Protein backbone atom coordinates (compact mmCIF):
# COMPACT_ATOMS: atom_id res chain seq x y z
CA UNK A 1 0.00 0.00 0.00
CA UNK A 2 1.03 3.59 -0.60
CA UNK A 3 -0.40 7.09 -0.47
CA UNK A 4 -0.99 9.13 -3.62
CA UNK A 5 -0.78 12.89 -3.11
CA UNK A 6 -1.44 15.86 -5.37
CA UNK A 7 1.26 16.55 -7.93
CA UNK A 8 1.63 20.28 -7.19
CA UNK A 9 1.41 20.07 -3.36
CA UNK A 10 -1.21 22.79 -2.72
CA UNK A 11 -1.23 24.92 0.42
CA UNK A 12 -3.28 23.63 3.34
CA UNK A 13 -6.80 25.02 3.51
CA UNK A 14 -10.00 24.32 5.45
CA UNK A 15 -13.04 23.51 3.30
CA UNK A 16 -16.45 23.92 4.89
CA UNK A 17 -19.14 21.37 4.07
CA UNK A 18 -22.86 21.98 3.59
CA UNK A 19 -25.80 20.61 5.56
CA UNK A 20 -26.45 18.19 2.66
CA UNK A 21 -22.84 16.96 2.86
CA UNK A 22 -23.22 16.42 6.60
CA UNK A 23 -26.27 14.19 6.29
CA UNK A 24 -24.26 11.97 3.87
CA UNK A 25 -21.19 11.92 6.13
CA UNK A 26 -21.57 8.35 7.49
CA UNK A 27 -21.93 6.79 4.01
CA UNK A 28 -19.30 5.38 1.65
CA UNK A 29 -19.54 5.10 -2.14
CA UNK A 30 -18.23 1.65 -3.08
CA UNK A 31 -17.82 1.02 -6.82
CA UNK A 32 -16.33 -1.96 -8.67
CA UNK A 33 -15.38 -2.29 -12.33
CA UNK A 34 -14.23 -5.35 -14.30
CA UNK A 35 -11.72 -5.00 -17.17
CA UNK A 36 -10.71 -7.52 -19.82
CA UNK A 37 -7.24 -5.98 -20.10
CA UNK A 38 -4.42 -5.33 -17.65
CA UNK A 39 -4.21 -1.68 -16.56
CA UNK A 40 -1.15 0.53 -16.78
CA UNK A 41 -0.97 1.29 -13.06
CA UNK A 42 1.97 3.68 -13.42
CA UNK A 43 -0.07 5.84 -15.79
CA UNK A 44 -3.10 5.59 -13.49
CA UNK A 45 -1.10 6.75 -10.45
CA UNK A 46 0.44 9.67 -12.32
CA UNK A 47 -2.98 10.75 -13.55
CA UNK A 48 -4.43 10.38 -10.05
CA UNK A 49 -1.74 12.66 -8.60
CA UNK A 50 -2.56 15.22 -11.28
CA UNK A 51 -6.29 14.79 -10.65
CA UNK A 52 -5.86 15.57 -6.95
CA UNK A 53 -4.57 19.04 -7.89
CA UNK A 54 -8.17 19.83 -8.81
CA UNK A 55 -9.83 17.71 -6.09
CA UNK A 56 -8.19 18.88 -2.83
CA UNK A 57 -10.85 17.45 -0.50
CA UNK A 58 -10.18 13.87 -1.64
CA UNK A 59 -6.57 14.02 -0.42
CA UNK A 60 -7.55 15.73 2.84
CA UNK A 61 -8.88 14.61 6.20
CA UNK A 62 -12.16 15.26 8.02
CA UNK A 63 -12.04 17.89 10.75
CA UNK A 64 -15.29 18.64 12.60
CA UNK A 65 -17.86 19.60 9.94
CA UNK A 66 -15.30 20.25 7.24
CA UNK A 67 -12.23 18.86 5.52
CA UNK A 68 -8.65 19.97 6.04
CA UNK A 69 -7.18 19.98 2.53
CA UNK A 70 -3.68 19.05 3.70
CA UNK A 71 -2.73 16.72 0.83
CA UNK A 72 -2.16 13.78 3.17
CA UNK A 73 -3.22 11.60 0.25
CA UNK A 74 -5.47 8.72 -0.70
CA UNK A 75 -4.72 5.03 -0.24
CA UNK A 76 -3.50 2.99 -3.21
CA UNK A 77 -3.11 -0.80 -3.33
CA UNK A 78 -2.24 -3.33 -6.01
CA UNK A 79 -2.66 -7.09 -5.73
CA UNK A 80 -2.20 -10.13 -7.98
CA UNK A 81 -4.82 -12.86 -8.23
CA UNK A 82 -3.49 -14.57 -11.34
CA UNK A 83 -5.31 -17.82 -10.57
CA UNK A 84 -8.57 -15.98 -11.33
CA UNK A 85 -9.88 -15.29 -14.81
CA UNK A 86 -12.63 -12.87 -15.78
CA UNK A 87 -15.11 -15.73 -16.11
CA UNK A 88 -14.47 -16.66 -12.45
CA UNK A 89 -15.72 -13.29 -11.18
CA UNK A 90 -19.42 -13.44 -10.36
CA UNK A 91 -21.46 -10.56 -11.69
CA UNK A 92 -24.64 -11.34 -9.78
CA UNK A 93 -23.24 -10.07 -6.49
CA UNK A 94 -20.67 -7.57 -5.23
CA UNK A 95 -17.11 -9.02 -5.52
CA UNK A 96 -15.74 -10.89 -2.52
CA UNK A 97 -13.61 -9.27 0.19
CA UNK A 98 -10.24 -10.08 -1.38
CA UNK A 99 -10.97 -7.54 -4.14
CA UNK A 100 -12.05 -4.75 -1.76
CA UNK A 101 -10.02 -1.61 -1.18
CA UNK A 102 -9.30 -0.96 2.49
CA UNK A 103 -11.53 1.73 3.95
CA UNK A 104 -11.86 2.36 7.70
CA UNK A 105 -14.94 4.56 7.82
CA UNK A 106 -14.84 5.06 11.59
CA UNK A 107 -11.24 6.27 11.38
CA UNK A 108 -12.05 8.43 8.34
CA UNK A 109 -14.84 10.16 10.25
CA UNK A 110 -12.35 10.83 13.05
CA UNK A 111 -9.89 12.39 10.61
CA UNK A 112 -7.42 9.51 10.89
CA UNK A 113 -7.92 7.75 7.54
CA UNK A 114 -8.04 8.79 3.85
CA UNK A 115 -11.35 9.81 2.32
CA UNK A 116 -10.72 7.71 -0.77
CA UNK A 117 -8.99 4.39 -1.37
CA UNK A 118 -8.23 2.49 -4.57
CA UNK A 119 -7.40 -1.16 -5.21
CA UNK A 120 -6.34 -2.74 -8.49
CA UNK A 121 -6.61 -6.54 -8.50
CA UNK A 122 -4.83 -8.10 -11.48
CA UNK A 123 -6.36 -11.29 -12.85
CA UNK A 124 -4.86 -13.65 -15.42
CA UNK A 125 -6.73 -11.94 -18.27
CA UNK A 126 -7.99 -8.67 -16.81
CA UNK A 127 -8.47 -6.70 -13.61
CA UNK A 128 -10.94 -5.62 -10.95
CA UNK A 129 -10.89 -1.96 -9.90
CA UNK A 130 -12.47 -0.93 -6.61
CA UNK A 131 -12.76 2.71 -5.54
CA UNK A 132 -14.21 3.65 -2.17
CA UNK A 133 -14.96 7.31 -1.48
CA UNK A 134 -16.52 9.05 1.49
CA UNK A 135 -20.01 10.30 0.59
CA UNK A 136 -19.10 13.38 2.65
CA UNK A 137 -16.98 14.50 -0.34
CA UNK A 138 -19.25 13.68 -3.24
CA UNK A 139 -22.60 12.35 -4.38
CA UNK A 140 -23.04 10.05 -7.38
CA UNK A 141 -22.84 12.86 -9.93
CA UNK A 142 -19.62 14.27 -8.46
CA UNK A 143 -18.06 10.83 -7.95
CA UNK A 144 -18.58 9.52 -11.49
CA UNK A 145 -17.51 12.86 -12.98
CA UNK A 146 -14.33 12.61 -10.91
CA UNK A 147 -13.73 9.05 -12.16
CA UNK A 148 -14.32 10.17 -15.75
CA UNK A 149 -11.83 13.01 -15.25
CA UNK A 150 -9.23 10.63 -13.80
CA UNK A 151 -9.61 8.24 -16.73
CA UNK A 152 -9.44 11.12 -19.22
CA UNK A 153 -6.22 12.44 -17.65
CA UNK A 154 -4.65 8.98 -17.93
CA UNK A 155 -5.84 8.54 -21.50
CA UNK A 156 -5.51 12.04 -22.99
CA UNK A 157 -3.98 14.31 -20.35
CA UNK A 158 -7.10 16.50 -20.32
CA UNK A 159 -9.96 16.90 -17.82
CA UNK A 160 -13.44 16.30 -19.21
CA UNK A 161 -15.07 18.75 -16.78
CA UNK A 162 -13.53 21.12 -14.27
CA UNK A 163 -14.90 20.54 -10.74
CA UNK A 164 -16.65 23.51 -9.15
CA UNK A 165 -15.59 23.80 -5.51
CA UNK A 166 -17.88 26.33 -3.85
CA UNK A 167 -18.29 25.78 -0.13
CA UNK A 168 -20.87 28.59 0.02
CA UNK A 169 -23.11 27.35 -2.81
CA UNK A 170 -25.80 25.71 -0.67
CA UNK A 171 -25.57 28.40 2.02
CA UNK A 172 -25.99 31.17 -0.58
CA UNK A 173 -28.85 29.31 -2.24
CA UNK A 174 -30.68 29.27 1.11
CA UNK A 175 -29.90 32.88 2.03
CA UNK A 176 -32.69 34.29 -0.14
CA UNK A 177 -35.35 31.89 1.21
CA UNK A 178 -37.92 33.35 3.62
CA UNK A 179 -39.11 29.80 4.39
CA UNK A 180 -35.63 28.72 5.42
CA UNK A 181 -35.02 31.78 7.59
CA UNK A 182 -38.36 31.31 9.31
CA UNK A 183 -37.70 27.65 10.05
CA UNK A 184 -34.17 27.97 11.41
CA UNK A 185 -35.20 30.84 13.69
CA UNK A 186 -38.33 29.12 15.06
CA UNK A 187 -38.66 26.89 18.11
CA UNK A 188 -38.84 23.10 17.68
CA UNK A 189 -42.60 22.82 18.19
CA UNK A 190 -43.31 25.42 15.51
CA UNK A 191 -40.89 23.81 13.07
CA UNK A 192 -42.31 20.31 13.63
CA UNK A 193 -45.85 21.59 13.10
CA UNK A 194 -44.81 23.29 9.88
CA UNK A 195 -43.02 20.19 8.59
CA UNK A 196 -46.06 18.02 9.29
CA UNK A 197 -48.36 20.53 7.59
CA UNK A 198 -46.08 20.26 4.53
CA UNK A 199 -46.55 16.47 4.46
CA UNK A 200 -43.32 15.38 6.15
CA UNK A 201 -43.38 12.09 8.09
CA UNK A 202 -42.00 11.73 11.60
CA UNK A 203 -39.55 8.83 11.98
CA UNK A 204 -41.01 6.53 14.63
CA UNK A 205 -39.51 3.83 16.84
CA UNK A 206 -41.16 1.05 14.83
CA UNK A 207 -39.42 2.12 11.62
CA UNK A 208 -36.05 2.38 13.37
CA UNK A 209 -36.51 -1.09 14.89
CA UNK A 210 -37.44 -2.62 11.52
CA UNK A 211 -34.47 -0.98 9.83
CA UNK A 212 -32.07 -2.20 12.52
CA UNK A 213 -33.47 -5.74 12.43
CA UNK A 214 -33.28 -6.04 8.64
CA UNK A 215 -29.75 -4.64 8.64
CA UNK A 216 -28.76 -7.09 11.39
CA UNK A 217 -30.16 -9.98 9.34
CA UNK A 218 -28.48 -8.65 6.20
CA UNK A 219 -31.80 -8.38 4.36
CA UNK A 220 -31.01 -4.84 3.21
CA UNK A 221 -27.95 -6.14 1.32
CA UNK A 222 -29.86 -8.62 -0.81
CA UNK A 223 -29.39 -7.82 -4.49
CA UNK A 224 -31.41 -9.24 -7.36
CA UNK A 225 -30.06 -10.33 -10.70
CA UNK A 226 -30.51 -7.42 -13.12
CA UNK A 227 -33.75 -7.19 -15.05
CA UNK A 228 -32.74 -6.18 -18.58
CA UNK A 229 -35.09 -3.71 -20.26
CA UNK A 230 -34.32 -3.17 -23.98
CA UNK A 231 -34.39 0.41 -25.27
CA UNK A 232 -36.84 -0.60 -27.99
CA UNK A 233 -39.33 -1.69 -25.30
CA UNK A 234 -38.97 1.66 -23.49
CA UNK A 235 -39.46 3.51 -26.80
CA UNK A 236 -42.53 1.38 -27.59
CA UNK A 237 -44.25 2.28 -24.30
CA UNK A 238 -43.39 5.97 -24.73
CA UNK A 239 -44.94 5.81 -28.20
CA UNK A 240 -48.11 4.12 -26.87
CA UNK A 241 -48.50 6.85 -24.22
CA UNK A 242 -48.06 9.55 -26.87
CA UNK A 243 -50.67 7.97 -29.15
CA UNK A 244 -53.22 7.42 -26.38
CA UNK A 245 -52.83 10.74 -24.54
CA UNK A 246 -51.08 13.08 -26.95
CA UNK A 247 -48.41 13.69 -24.30
CA UNK A 248 -44.75 12.77 -24.18
CA UNK A 249 -43.35 11.04 -21.10
CA UNK A 250 -39.74 10.64 -20.04
CA UNK A 251 -37.69 7.47 -19.99
CA UNK A 252 -37.60 7.55 -16.19
CA UNK A 253 -41.41 7.49 -15.89
CA UNK A 254 -41.63 4.49 -18.22
CA UNK A 255 -38.99 2.56 -16.27
CA UNK A 256 -40.76 3.38 -12.99
CA UNK A 257 -44.08 2.08 -14.31
CA UNK A 258 -42.41 -1.07 -15.64
CA UNK A 259 -40.78 -1.66 -12.24
CA UNK A 260 -44.14 -1.43 -10.46
CA UNK A 261 -45.74 -3.72 -13.04
CA UNK A 262 -42.93 -6.24 -12.47
CA UNK A 263 -43.26 -6.05 -8.66
CA UNK A 264 -47.08 -5.95 -8.45
CA UNK A 265 -47.74 -9.66 -7.89
CA UNK A 266 -44.38 -10.37 -6.24
CA UNK A 267 -45.07 -7.74 -3.55
CA UNK A 268 -48.82 -8.36 -3.24
CA UNK A 269 -49.72 -4.86 -4.45
CA UNK A 270 -52.96 -5.65 -6.27
CA UNK A 271 -55.68 -3.35 -4.96
CA UNK A 272 -53.12 -1.20 -3.12
CA UNK A 273 -51.70 2.29 -3.45
CA UNK A 274 -47.93 2.54 -3.74
CA UNK A 275 -45.74 5.53 -3.01
CA UNK A 276 -42.69 6.09 -5.17
CA UNK A 277 -39.85 8.24 -3.86
CA UNK A 278 -37.30 9.75 -6.26
CA UNK A 279 -33.79 11.04 -5.67
CA UNK A 280 -33.31 14.40 -7.40
CA UNK A 281 -30.07 16.16 -8.34
CA UNK A 282 -30.35 19.92 -7.73
CA UNK A 283 -27.41 20.84 -9.99
CA UNK A 284 -28.59 23.31 -12.60
CA UNK A 285 -32.05 23.31 -10.99
CA UNK A 286 -31.36 25.36 -7.88
CA UNK A 287 -29.87 28.81 -8.50
CA UNK A 288 -26.25 28.91 -7.39
CA UNK A 289 -25.61 25.17 -7.64
CA UNK A 290 -23.88 24.66 -10.98
CA UNK A 291 -23.70 21.60 -13.21
CA UNK A 292 -20.13 20.80 -12.09
CA UNK A 293 -20.63 21.44 -8.36
CA UNK A 294 -18.29 19.19 -6.35
CA UNK A 295 -20.18 18.02 -3.30
CA UNK A 296 -23.61 16.65 -2.43
CA UNK A 297 -26.56 18.20 -4.22
CA UNK A 298 -29.01 15.29 -4.35
CA UNK A 299 -31.76 14.16 -2.00
CA UNK A 300 -35.16 12.47 -1.95
CA UNK A 301 -38.32 14.45 -2.68
CA UNK A 302 -41.98 14.01 -1.75
CA UNK A 303 -43.41 10.76 -3.12
CA UNK A 304 -45.71 10.16 -6.05
CA UNK A 305 -48.66 7.93 -5.03
CA UNK A 306 -50.90 5.90 -7.36
CA UNK A 307 -52.78 2.62 -7.67
CA UNK A 308 -50.57 -0.36 -8.48
CA UNK A 309 -53.43 -1.74 -10.61
CA UNK A 310 -53.09 0.93 -13.30
CA UNK A 311 -51.89 -0.08 -16.78
CA UNK A 312 -48.24 0.69 -17.52
CA UNK A 313 -49.11 3.53 -19.89
CA UNK A 314 -51.40 5.23 -17.36
CA UNK A 315 -48.83 4.82 -14.58
CA UNK A 316 -46.08 6.30 -16.75
CA UNK A 317 -48.23 9.35 -17.58
CA UNK A 318 -49.23 9.89 -13.94
CA UNK A 319 -45.64 9.52 -12.65
CA UNK A 320 -44.35 11.92 -15.29
CA UNK A 321 -47.02 14.54 -14.53
CA UNK A 322 -46.60 14.30 -10.75
CA UNK A 323 -42.82 14.54 -10.94
CA UNK A 324 -43.06 17.64 -13.11
CA UNK A 325 -45.35 19.16 -10.49
CA UNK A 326 -43.04 18.20 -7.60
CA UNK A 327 -40.09 19.69 -9.50
CA UNK A 328 -41.86 22.86 -10.59
CA UNK A 329 -39.90 25.97 -9.64
CA UNK A 330 -42.03 27.20 -6.73
CA UNK A 331 -42.52 23.77 -5.14
CA UNK A 332 -38.87 22.87 -5.52
CA UNK A 333 -37.69 26.17 -4.04
CA UNK A 334 -39.91 25.67 -1.00
CA UNK A 335 -38.97 22.01 -0.58
CA UNK A 336 -35.24 22.74 -0.83
CA UNK A 337 -35.57 25.21 2.06
CA UNK A 338 -37.70 22.79 4.12
CA UNK A 339 -35.33 19.89 3.59
CA UNK A 340 -32.17 21.84 4.44
CA UNK A 341 -33.71 23.40 7.56
CA UNK A 342 -34.94 19.98 8.66
CA UNK A 343 -31.52 18.35 8.42
CA UNK A 344 -29.69 21.34 9.87
CA UNK A 345 -31.88 21.18 12.98
CA UNK A 346 -31.48 17.36 13.04
CA UNK A 347 -35.22 16.78 13.19
CA UNK A 348 -36.54 13.18 12.85
CA UNK A 349 -38.57 13.73 9.69
CA UNK A 350 -38.49 12.48 6.11
CA UNK A 351 -40.56 13.34 3.02
CA UNK A 352 -41.91 9.75 2.94
CA UNK A 353 -43.24 7.15 5.37
CA UNK A 354 -40.18 5.22 6.54
CA UNK A 355 -42.38 2.71 8.37
CA UNK A 356 -44.09 1.79 5.10
CA UNK A 357 -40.73 1.52 3.33
CA UNK A 358 -39.26 -0.91 5.90
CA UNK A 359 -42.35 -2.94 6.79
CA UNK A 360 -42.65 -6.67 6.12
CA UNK A 361 -44.91 -5.81 3.18
CA UNK A 362 -43.61 -2.44 1.96
CA UNK A 363 -45.72 -0.21 -0.27
CA UNK A 364 -43.22 2.66 -0.36
CA UNK A 365 -40.19 2.29 -2.62
CA UNK A 366 -37.23 4.56 -3.30
CA UNK A 367 -36.07 4.74 -6.91
CA UNK A 368 -32.52 5.80 -7.73
CA UNK A 369 -31.98 6.53 -11.41
CA UNK A 370 -28.24 6.25 -12.13
CA UNK A 371 -28.52 6.33 -15.92
CA UNK A 372 -27.13 9.85 -16.27
CA UNK A 373 -23.83 8.80 -14.68
CA UNK A 374 -21.07 7.83 -17.09
CA UNK A 375 -20.38 4.62 -15.16
CA UNK A 376 -18.57 3.05 -18.12
CA UNK A 377 -16.46 6.15 -18.85
CA UNK A 378 -13.43 4.79 -17.00
CA UNK A 379 -11.05 3.88 -19.82
CA UNK A 380 -7.57 4.66 -18.46
CA UNK A 381 -5.91 4.04 -21.83
CA UNK A 382 -5.97 0.24 -22.03
CA UNK A 383 -9.69 -0.22 -22.71
CA UNK A 384 -12.90 0.49 -20.85
CA UNK A 385 -14.63 -1.79 -18.34
CA UNK A 386 -16.72 -4.70 -19.54
CA UNK A 387 -18.89 -4.63 -16.42
CA UNK A 388 -19.71 -2.25 -13.57
CA UNK A 389 -21.45 -3.57 -10.49
CA UNK A 390 -24.26 -1.46 -9.00
CA UNK A 391 -23.52 0.48 -5.83
CA UNK A 392 -24.24 -1.45 -2.64
CA UNK A 393 -26.65 1.15 -1.22
CA UNK A 394 -30.06 -0.13 -0.15
CA UNK A 395 -32.22 1.70 -2.70
CA UNK A 396 -35.08 -0.77 -3.36
CA UNK A 397 -35.09 0.03 -7.10
CA UNK A 398 -32.08 1.19 -9.10
CA UNK A 399 -31.86 1.96 -12.82
CA UNK A 400 -28.31 1.16 -13.92
CA UNK A 401 -26.45 1.48 -17.24
CA UNK A 402 -26.15 -1.83 -19.07
CA UNK A 403 -22.69 -3.03 -20.18
CA UNK A 404 -21.23 -1.91 -23.53
CA UNK A 405 -22.93 -3.63 -26.43
CA UNK A 406 -26.27 -4.08 -24.64
CA UNK A 407 -28.81 -1.52 -25.81
CA UNK A 408 -30.97 -1.15 -22.75
CA UNK A 409 -31.15 -0.65 -18.99
CA UNK A 410 -30.43 -2.89 -16.02
CA UNK A 411 -33.01 -2.67 -13.21
CA UNK A 412 -31.81 -3.93 -9.83
CA UNK A 413 -33.94 -4.63 -6.76
CA UNK A 414 -32.60 -4.79 -3.21
CA UNK A 415 -33.74 -5.83 0.26
CA UNK A 416 -37.30 -7.15 0.42
CA UNK A 417 -37.80 -6.17 -3.22
CA UNK A 418 -35.03 -8.54 -4.40
Where are the regions a protein language model picked out?
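Non-catalytic N-terminal regions of enzymes
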Residues: 1-192, 218-228, 234-292, 350-418
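Acyltransferase donor/substrate-recognition loop-hinge adjacent to the catalytic core
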Residues: 203-220
Amino acid sequence: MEYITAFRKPEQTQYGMSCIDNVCKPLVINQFWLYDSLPDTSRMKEALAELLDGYPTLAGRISDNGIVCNNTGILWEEADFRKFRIKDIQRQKIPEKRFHAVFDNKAALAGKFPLMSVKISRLEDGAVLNVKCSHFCADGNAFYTMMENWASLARTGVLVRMPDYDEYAVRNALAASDVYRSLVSSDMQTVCSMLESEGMFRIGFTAIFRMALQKLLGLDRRLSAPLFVPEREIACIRDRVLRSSGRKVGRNAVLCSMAVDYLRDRMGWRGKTVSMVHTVDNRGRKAGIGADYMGNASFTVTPVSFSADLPIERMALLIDEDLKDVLSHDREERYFALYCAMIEKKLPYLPFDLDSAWSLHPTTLIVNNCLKFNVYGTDFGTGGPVFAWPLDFGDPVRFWPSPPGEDGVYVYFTGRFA
